[in-house]
Amino acid sequence: MKNAFRFKQFEIDQTGCAMRINTDGVLLGAVAGKNEAANILDIGTGTGVIALMLAQRFPNALVDAVEIDEQAALTATKNALNAPFSGRLKVLHSAIEDYLPEKYYDLIVSNPPYFVNDLKNPEHRKGVARHTDAHFFEQLLERVAAMLSRDGRFWFILPLKQAQNIVDMAKFYGLGMAVVLHIHSDENKPEIRQIVCLDYSGQPAHHHNLYIYAGKGLYTDAYKVLLKDFFLAF
């Protein structure tokens, strides 16, 4: 299948999805977690890849995935139905502000759009997937705070500036950094992304570095260990 990306336990069809599988998404799917997670929510699921990775990693969890784009939601639903853990996955076509579940989640994840107030992408659907405005992060945090259990964790991946914006806004809701993974392309390059975990614990944050490449075309052992349960190449 031309638009398919095969993982060890499932396959992702990317047909009709404005945002295709990328390093940000698979890293978040491999890193985000909470001990004994029972109810998981993926906000802005796209192809469904993060939700599927979490369903694989947490075999006793129920995973809900919300997607605002109708075509992407249809594709994610197809991918979920074709997965071996389809019985624990549910994809919903909804904006996050309209999603009102009757339960709390102990693990929420999001790989959100991040070009805040930038030039909008000329293709509307890619614009929705990649760009946002100043109010988006506020709406996201408001909904996360309303849906997250008191001992739950919210994980996201963003460039540094946008990650700091969310961290600053999260204080209003009593959420603070628990874990920060600083991502570099290699050990000689500056940080390009942060995976951040927010929770209500008030404990000091744990900081770690991840380097993707050890040399030209060579992945680091740490990167391969993170993704060895998913990527066929590892």
From Swiss-Prot:
Q: Name one GO cellular component term.
A: cytoplasm
InterPro entries in the record = DNA_methylase_N6_adenine_CS (IPR002052), SAM-dependent_MTases_sf (IPR029063), Small_mtfrase_dom (IPR007848), tRNA_Adenine-N(6)_MTase (IPR050210), tRNA_adenine-N6_MeTrfase (IPR022882)
According to the record, the signal peptide region is: none
Q: Where in the cell is it found?
A: Cytoplasm
* Catalytic activity, reaction form: adenosine(37) in tRNA1(Val) + S-adenosyl-L-methionine = N(6)-methyladenosine(37) in tRNA1(Val) + S-adenosyl-L-homocysteine + H(+)
Record-linked Gene3D superfamilies: Vaccinia Virus protein VP39
Entry EC no(s): 2.1.1.223
Q: What terms describe the molecular function in GO for this protein?
A: nucleic acid binding; tRNA (adenine-N6)-methyltransferase activity
Q: What class of enzyme is it?
A: transferase
Family annotation (PROSITE patterns)? N6_MTASE (PS00092)
- Does the UniProt entry include the keyword Transferase? yes
Which keywords fit this entry according to its UniProt record? Cytoplasm, Methyltransferase, S-adenosyl-L-methionine, Transferase, tRNA processing
**UniProt GO BP:** methylation; tRNA processing
What does it do?
Specifically methylates the adenine in position 37 of tRNA(1)(Val) (anticodon cmo5UAC).
The record's family statement is: Belongs to the methyltransferase superfamily. tRNA (adenine-N(6)-)-methyltransferase family.
Q: Which PANTHER family match?
A: TRNA1(VAL) (ADENINE(37)-N6)-METHYLTRANSFERASE
Record protein name field: tRNA1(Val) (adenine(37)-N6)-methyltransferase
